[in-house]
């Protein structure tokens, strides 16, 4: 039977806990993050401190956000790092990163947040969507994720991995794969392969939309029916004539459109919101 206990703490399934313990992998991740002494770093889900300790050694202060009460308390009493750590016991998916940015006077210091973490795989996608809202105040993000999620983040159009997550991530960020991580690097070992990704928010959005609601709406509708042609998948939002006028191939499918295409559709809807569902033509 595989042990779920590491360094005296039993992994909790509801928090999706898998603790990183491979020192070579840890050092490679820290090198990729490249923390600098004066920078403001935030770790999400520090767990038992595998990344916390080597990163904290390189900075003056490190903020960590941990939902597990036992782990948060453990970090508050860390034998040699507790004075460097600002431990916030909170759900990162509900956390207001802009308030942290304001409280720390980062604008006056001409700094942005640098965010990293070994994310629980069961919340990684909604957590990234939450963080994208704060793209203007984030310098970069480094996350350990399920390998398949990293493939989706990095995907190009016309591929099976390309989807709504791809579009939303690349709308806000430059996405770069960093390294792959085997299950044996964790305790307990997950059943899936993992990988580290770097997300660098664009200083200027390459395809700005007028209202994110419509980008979310059109991508959700298209990819929820990705086997259908766009003529059918988007029939409640656009007539066939309008799609053609917007330079969209009626026989194309969701994965065939670029981010620029989806932004163009979203901006049309922002200016011309459908008053009621259209019928397929």
From Swiss-Prot:
The keyword Translocase does not apply. Its main location: cytoplasm. The keyword Ligase does not apply. Pfam families: RrnaAD. SUPFAM superfamilies: S-adenosyl-L-methionine-dependent methyltransferases. One of its GO terms (molecular function) is RNA binding. This is Ribosomal RNA small subunit methyltransferase A. Signal peptide: none annotated. Belongs to the class I-like SAM-binding methyltransferase superfamily. rRNA adenine N(6)-methyltransferase family. RsmA subfamily. It catalyses: adenosine(1518)/adenosine(1519) in 16S rRNA + 4 S-adenosyl-L-methionine = N(6)-dimethyladenosine(1518)/N(6)-dimethyladenosine(1519) in 16S rRNA + 4 S-adenosyl-L-homocysteine + 4 H(+). It is found in: Cytoplasm. S-adenosyl-L-methionine binds at residues 18, 20, 45, 66, 91, 118. It comes from the Bacteria.
């Amino acid at each position: 039977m595989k042990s779920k206990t590491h360094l005296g703490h039993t992994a909790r399934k509801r928090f999706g806990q898998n603790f990183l313990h491979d020192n070579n992998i840890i050092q490679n991740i820290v090198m990729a993050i490249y923390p600098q002494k004066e920078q403001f770093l935030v770790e999400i889900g520090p767990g038992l401190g595998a990344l916390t300790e080597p990163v904290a050694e390189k900075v003056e202060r490190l903020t960590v956000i941990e939902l597990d009460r036992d782990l948060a308390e453990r970090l508050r009493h860390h034998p040699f790092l507790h004075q460097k750590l600002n431990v916030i016991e909170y759900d990162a998916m509900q956390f207001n990163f802009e308030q942290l940015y304001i409280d720390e006077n980062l604008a006056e210091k001409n700094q942005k947040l640098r965010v990293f973490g070994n994310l629980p795989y069961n919340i990684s996608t909604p957590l990234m969507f939450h963080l994208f809202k704060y793209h203007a105040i984030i310098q970069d993000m480094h996350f350990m994720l399920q390998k398949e999620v990293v493939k989706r983040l990095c995907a190009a159009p016309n591929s099976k991995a390309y989807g709504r997550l791809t579009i939303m991530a690349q709308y806000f960020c430059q996405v770069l794969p960093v390294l792959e991580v085997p299950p044996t690097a964790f305790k307990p070992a997950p059943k899936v392969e993992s990988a580290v990704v770097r997300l660098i928010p664009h200083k200027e959005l390459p395809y700005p939309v007028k209202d994110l609601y419509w980008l979310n709406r059109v991508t959700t509708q298209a990819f929820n029916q990705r086997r259908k042609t766009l003529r059918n998948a988007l029939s409640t939002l656009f007539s066939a004539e309008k799609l053609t006028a917007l330079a969209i191939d009626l026989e194309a499918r969701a994965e065939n459109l670029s981010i620029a295409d989806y932004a163009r559709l979203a901006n049309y809807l922002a200016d011309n919101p459908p008053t009621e569902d259209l019928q397929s033509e």
